[in-house]
Amino acid sequence: MTVIHDLPDADYHTRPELSSTGARLLLPEFGGSPAKFKYRQGREYTSAAFDVGKAVHAAVLGVGAEAVAYPEDVLASNGAASTKAAKEWADSVRFEGKIPMKAADLRPITGMSEAVLRHPTARALFELPGHREVSVFSEVDGVKVRARFDALTDETPQGVFGIDLKTTSDSADGDTFTKTVVKYGYHVQEQWYRETLGQDIRFAFVVVESTAPYLVAVHELGLAYKDMGKTLAKVARDLYAECEATNTWPGHPEDVQVLEPPVWAAMAHEERYALSSEIRI
């Protein structure tokens, strides 16, 4: 196992080892497939939400890609970043490892980062002795894997913590975030990080809402999530190894698929129309 502190973001993401993001991209549970994984491999990916997340990380952790505002003189008269000058400036900023944003878009970044640091539990976690942006490389089940902790603490009386900062456009409350965990496979990420590190550490998600008042919550996942994540991480590694060995990266099935309604839809139909029949009688 190799542990590297302060590895530049670009250097980490161009490494060939399988990451938890790649693992989830392989799995149909998260809308993935080997074909989608192969297509994305080696391609740079960015989005407005991705940029916001990276900028908040940098503001809270003090490391990573800093967000910088477009100069007014490169913007169009309506304020759009659509001019040739704006695009060239943005390209140069990204080349420097920074994130171009309009000045108005920087205010929520400040709001979110300040909200995280005001939250007593979140702040206490980030102030524990340890390191920020810790990159770990190892081998699990014969597959070379990697993980990048936002923060990894030293041993504390409560144990070693891996900490992951998430921004969300939904609520950060537990009832909502548990659905987000299932949707995006954060339980797979958590277990992937544990297995890559080779330690059964505690893992905390610090979640901040992306709209004012930028509410914050801190969550740990329970044992059922741990078991589910462990199973899916294993499935992803095995699938990756098989695809690599055969150089075959399948997408959707090629034959005709006969579909049946989901259980919830069938039950809703049955309840509605069974009730209608009773009323008519």
Label for each model-derived stretch:
Residues 1-148:
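Metal-dependent nuclease catalytic cores that hydrolyze phosphodiester bonds in DNA/RNA
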Residues 137-139, 152-154, 206-208:
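A generic structural motif
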Residues 34-38, 169-171, 210-216:
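Short acidic (Asp/Glu) and glycine-rich catalytic loops that position anionic groups and cofactors
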Residues 180-183, 187, 192-281:
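Metal-dependent nuclease catalytic regions and adjoining charged, substrate-binding loops involved
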Residues 58-59, 63, 161, 191-195, ...:
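Residue-level signal for well-ordered alpha-helical scaffold segments within enzymatic catalytic domains
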Residues 122-128, 153-161, 197-202:
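Secondary-structure boundary elements
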Residues 42-45, 94-101, 174-184, 222-224:
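Short histidine-centered catalytic/ligand-binding loop motif
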Residues 147-179, 193:
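Conserved catalytic cores of phosphodiester-cleaving nucleases, focusing on short active-site segments
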